[in-house]
Every structure is written in structure tokens, then in C-alpha cells.
């Protein structure tokens, strides 16, 4: 088995263990085109105001009441598509949401990657 194959297999297992899928920009874009997907931006209000994915809800994952606010607003019968600036905070938020019974996808490269690819 090549090193690349081994790393790919390890990464795939880790993603499954987290309970959510991290998607590249194009796959995320296709996923959020579905009207049954809720778009969640977990950056600060200031970052969100500078630009965001259309129709996204903003709940700052760094706020102490993120979990309470998210679970009171987000529907559990829909997929939650999470993004942040670069992918770190969205992974944290995705983990919290999965723990609370949500089905989650996450934009691996964040809003920066989204913009970089011309969106």
C-alpha cells in the first residue's frame, strides 16, 4: 500500500469517526443547493457582516451559549451545512451539532476557500 493510500484511508476513517463529512467547495456548493439544507455560518457577527454564503444563519461558535442557541434554532430534521473562515471553527461546531443529534456537513476550506474559488 502506498503512503498516499494509507493516509487517505486514515483520513477517511477519521472523518467517519467525527460523525460529519468535510466537503471541498464544489461538493459543498452542490449540497447547499438543496432547499432542505440549512446553511450555518459560525464566525463572529463582524466576520459575517463582511460577507457570507447566501441565506446563511449566523451563530458564533465561540460564544459560551452556542450549543443552547444552535439547538433552539436549528431543525433536527434537516441537514446542517456549517462553515467558518478557514475550517477550524466549523469542525468544532459540527462536532457539537453531531453530539446533539444533527446530521452535519462542513465546508473544509471555510469561507476563505469559498471566495477563493469565485463564489
How should each PLM-predicted stretch be described?
Residues 4-7, 11-31, 37, 46-79, ...:
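Rhodanese-like catalytic fold shared by cysteine-dependent sulfurtransferases
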Residues 39-41:
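Structural scaffold elements adjacent to functional motifs in cytosolic proteins
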